[in-house]
Amino acid sequence: MSNALISGLDPASFSSVIKPVDDLFRYVNGPWIDTYRLPDDRSRYGSFDKLAEDAENQIRDILEDDDCPAVKSRALYHAFCDTDTINQAGITPIRADLDAIDQAADKTSLTRVLGSLNPTGGSDQFAMAGYGDPGDPEHNIVHIEQAGIGLPDEAYYCEDHYAPVREQYVAMVAKQLRQAGYGDELQTEEQAHRFLEVETRIASHHWDNVATRDSQKTYNPTDFAALSETLAHFDLAAWIGAWQAAYDATAAGTAQSLDLKAIMQHIIVHEPSFLAGLDAFWAASELDDLKLWARVHTITGWAGMLSREFDETNFAFYGKVLSGAKQQRDRWKRGVSLVNGVCGEDVGREYVKRHFPESSKQRMEQLVGNLIDAYRVSISTSDWLGEATKTKALEKLSKFTAKVGYTNHWRDYAALDVRDDAGLVDNMRAASLYENGYQLSKAGQPVDRDEWLMNPQTVNAYYEPSLNVIVFPAAILQPPFFNPEADDAANYGGIGAVIGHEIGHGFDDQGSQYDGDGKLNNWWTDEDRARFEQRTKALIEQYNGFIPRQLAEKYADDPQKAPHVNGALTIGENIGDLGGVNIALKAYAFALDAASGKPEDGSPEAIRAALDAAPDIDGFTGLQRFFLGYASIWRTKQRDELAEQYLQIDPHSPAEFRTNGIVRNVDLFYAAFDVKPTDAMWLDHDQRVRIW
């Protein structure tokens, strides 16, 4: 059968009751959502998760193969799955850490303890990593960001809506303290309540999720002297000295030498007011409160690697309360996730050999090229961009780099000291040492433009503004996103929209502040930026009005409590989605023209003519199949708890609005399904947002 006769869709699964003109998302996905029962170990399942599950099974097969070439990945996997040894050890693997915290005689001593524990996986109240400098994208620099809290974000500590979550959090902390031997029920409950008060003071200095994604506000270059002054009561010099001594005393320190103080001479602070607040917190806090914070974070940070009682208590809160899961995932599945996170490229290289055909890479590279061509036409013909900004935008687009499938520069794990004869915690300490050394040793060095931030077995994609690069790992290049045997319509609606989305991040509210070389640099005229922000404001307002159906039903008796989408938090992803669909449509039209020997023509009339000429398959036109393919990739079902958490912290909108909220702004959607003003999906023409 010819490829052109295969739609790549499953029309039999579509709704016979819901119409696409009223709810495209549920027309395509409604019957599945209504009948699919989430397994007890899942908080969410959908198109992305199905592919991740497939990759998970494939990685397991590799790790359990006696001839597995990824020996360090295999050793870590087996250490995690050896529950007999883990359960026998109890809390012993971290007892020395806790003793060191308990014995700290003053704040400086505690600072040194925290510094000594950080390289091997200990928690701290700020996070540190080495990666590209937005002001000098050719070089890496140390970045410092806020940290120090155990709930998803600062809102969980102050909003009445989260009071029940805080109660459960306190109960979890108290139980973990009892399990670690820090008193009876009454004593540990008092400690847990005090801990929440301490952590709430830290959270009060945190920036919210909208502010932390602001590229300009979070770019604050400084130096070691200024940082030391800001953290005068924390004693940064003592912390660094202890960190260095602990790191140097390990095999990783020998294999990946670094001078922490030297590389911190130039740094970027993401949230300056947080560090000032953290210093005030240290100045005002009692030593016992600081030790309590360190003690709890040491226990909860390692709980998932400790014996059953710690692991189950940790899951009861983070898995059940926050995410709604009913039971833990199988141990082997968690082991695969751990390996993917620690040394994913080690096993990923074998994954690519076994499961990624070179033909898929070639087809994807062609699709990416078509999408970039479509963006070029869209920018060139924009009716709201001035010529100066168009020129800069086209220059940036010409410098885009696409990476497909897998890296050609695999990470070297020689310094990763994971061993078959070591316990899980010891191996995880070795993994933390390796990762700290690997990341921080980049500071001051040229950026490795061949490095990937995702493993090939990851079902995702990303745009990195400081490199002006879009990356598509191998695992996402499968149905429903990409089917090499299918007609183009569903592929452009699936992976084409994803490609367009990632390219679109280069021109969203944050990515548009970086130039073609990845430098944080304003290349817009004031007039064009104002017009851009006018359009994004309209999209923000649209999304602010969206409430996920499942939460509207949950709060039906008190609708005012129903949480809604945060348009400002999700605007970057929404711009990416909207641009992705519009540009993928244009690229699909260009592909149809190319197949029929016609020259590329970006006029609306030519695009419509090309789309109308596409063959009907499975009773749908090419234009309809494009939108049906797009809706298919967002098939998702999740528990209420996770839906609420994501509304607070996730910059992505819920799946139903990544579908319906986007296509109602796309004129060709109305043409595809003959949408009328009386239909639920209708949005008046003057209210539709058009950006790219």
What does each model-identified segment do?
Residues 64-366, 370:
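Noncatalytic, helix-rich "gating/capping" subdomain that lines the substrate-entry/channel surface
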